[in-house]
């Protein structure tokens, strides 16, 4: 296990940046569902059948999620014991509620991921590896909009993305500081972090509401 405080922060930062890259890719594919049903089906079919994605990248992603949460839990325990927030980015936004409640927002996001895996990943495993149903490259869009027929699910998804936005608002910029990026780039990183933290979660909310209203 990673022992030193600095090593834990760097590990937390790197795993967070890795998950941000995945989030950007996931959003890009999902957003195509509001533009083109055919394009969304093609991209989803590729991601769902490509061996590299299924048997290498997907396990790495799952490990990354678990690792990031475990590191966050360890940092939270260490911070509580020392009665100070060690994992912080000294700026106007980081000294707020956001930076003091990263663990809480992380718990909400983890709960959302549990529902998300149940909604999409578990049925996919059942479809391909338990029931051995025939390959249907056109099924992905219908499966997506079916999940967003439920207003309670849409509401929970939307609330979860609000917490994701708050989590990213602090974590994105903090990650670069933790890995030692020069202060010379701080303002640019902060601007990109805020834009990403607002626009991507808002985009996910838009996708959910769009399919609820048009499904």
Q: What feature does the model see in each segment?
A:
Residues 1-215:
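Membrane-embedded alpha-helical bundles that constitute the cytochrome b-like, heme-associated redox core
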